[in-house]
Amino acid sequence: MIIGPGMVFSGGVKILEQPVPYVAGLFKTTYAGYFADVPSFFATATPTTYGTNPSTSVQTTTISEAGSDDGSNFSIQWLGYFLPSTTETYTFFTASDDASYMWIGANALSGFTTANATVNNGGEHAVQERSGTIELTAGVYYPIRIQFGEAGGGDAMTFNYSTPTITKTTNVTGRVFYNPATNGF
């Protein structure tokens, strides 16, 4: 079923048939304040900055954010699509201080909660890594949503993925895209 230019539904997941006019990277929005493990925070909060992944921190090739340990409270959301290069089980990881969540597929678009996150690394904590797995098909553009929040103290965020044939990596070159017309999906 075609829903719009280049969009179809397959098994309940909105996928992209081709990346044009989509561009490399994820759309990043930063907010003042800690989202306190409430994913809907981002729908009502006013962004302080937004744009694509800057090359100095959250890059097109790496989704990572590291702070200065200044105790500032902030939250970040990244939106876009993940394009698997192989058909197999993908393991996604977030290593964060404090909370981070990642959704891929239909749950990234709507109905996303902490309970249905692909990766649930919630709560206030020092850097810790959590992971989740999902079967993905090569060549299908899956919606992806990553949320991160810093409540105080140290702050860090790194996103990785691996498969049985792909060594764990932060390199998402050619794997993530976003729609500049809608700032994400």
Can you annotate each of these PLM segments?
Residues 1-21:
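N-terminal low-complexity, intrinsically disordered "leader/linker" segments enriched in small/polar
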Residues 18-185:
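Acidic/polar, compositionally biased interaction segments
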